[in-house]
Structure formats: C-alpha cells, structure tokens
C-alpha cells in the first residue's frame, strides 16, 4: 500500500450518539461519577443544557477514526483538546486529514489531525494522532 500524502482527507465516521446510557456505562467503567456527567439537574444548575459526556469518552470515540483508518497502522500517540461540552444525546461525526508524512527506514510516520463535530458542524474536540506505517 502506498504512503498517504499530506492533505489527504479521511472519510467522515459517525462517533455517536452519546446518549445518557453510554455516558453512564463510561462513568461506571472509568470510576468518574461526577454528577455533571450523570445528573441533568446538576448540569443545568451550573449552566449546561444537560448532562455532558466525559472528555475521555469523546476522545476514545475520536480515536476510532485513527485506529480504523488503515489496518496496517500502529498508533504511537494520540492527543486531544476539548473545545466545548458534549451534551447527552449528541450525535458526533469524526473527520480529519493527513497533516504530515515522514519517511523512516522501515516505513512512514504519519500525523493525522482529527476533529469531532456535533450535528451542527461545531467542533467539540480536536485530536492529533501519530501513526507508524510499515514498508
């Protein structure tokens, strides 16, 4: 398989919806039972529209875009910045592009820039994944 080129777009991938049940499952698995994630009344009391998804849950969903991009890719690192709360019920979509490709002796190192967008197209999270490709 040929190496990707900088600027190459990744196909958009659905990352949600992130409903209350998914948020509750994540809270149990992670041990993060902050009421802002689990109790709509608490979230509204601090000015949010509803309970919100955990940032790491959003990050995990966004990482699917990098992990599913090429079967031969090995993830070296993944960073994420959260730009807005993600209320329960949000339907996120991930998209991205190849930002950089470096040739190595045994393959290529690729940096992907990734975005998680809500149904209105607003960016909820921005990620950067570094992947290693063989050959």
For the regions a protein language model found, what residue spans apply to each?
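Catalytic strand-loop segment that frames the active site of acyl-thioester-processing enzymes
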Residues: 1-51
């Amino acid at each position: 398989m040929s190496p990707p080129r900088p600027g190459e777009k990744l196909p958009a991938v659905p990352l949600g919806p992130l409903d209350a049940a998914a948020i509750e499952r994540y809270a149990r698995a992670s041990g993060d039972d902050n009421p802002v994630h689990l109790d709509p009344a608490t979230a509204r009391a601090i000015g949010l529209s509803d309970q919100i998804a955990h940032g790491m849950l959003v990050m995990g969903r966004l990482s699917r875009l990098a992990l599913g991009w090429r079967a031969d890719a090995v993830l070296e690192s993944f960073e994420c910045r959260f730009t807005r709360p993600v209320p329960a019920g949000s339907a996120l979509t991930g998209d991205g592009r190849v930002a950089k490709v470096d040739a190595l002796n045994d393959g290529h190192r690729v940096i992907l820039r990734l975005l998680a967008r809500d149904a209105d197209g607003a960016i909820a999270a921005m990620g950067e994944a570094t992947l290693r490709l063989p050959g």
